[in-house]
């Protein structure tokens, strides 16, 4: 949770949520020589929390994939860039969101070609900065 001291609290992401990601085939691990150094969910299709945005998405007409729950063990740099590169082989239109306090993730998203589009609210009602790459 480097740079992410307030976004992942109170047991988030829960074991149940991660199990759902696995069951749907949406959870991916990044490993080298059998050692996991990163994890993320990649979900293709409409994200209900992205339906309402204070701002505007750049493209509402083409299918997109969303990167969620990206985490690393802190031993490598470029974990987000690696996840984005992989996701782009599946779909060229990507979205992501992060907490306003997670400046590290905001910078990484910008470097990975994402543009900040506005603010969305996640299921519990808290705001997140919304990003899109097309």
Residue positions per predicted region:
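Conserved GNAT-fold acetyl-CoA-binding loop/helix
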Residues: 1-17
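Conserved beta-strand in the GNAT
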Residues: 29, 35-45
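Conserved acetyl-CoA-binding loop-helix of GNAT-fold acetyltransferases
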Residues: 72-89, 106-111
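Conserved active-site alpha-helix within GNAT-family acetyltransferase domains
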Residues: 100-118, 126
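C-terminal "cap" of GNAT-fold acetyltransferases
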Residues: 122-134
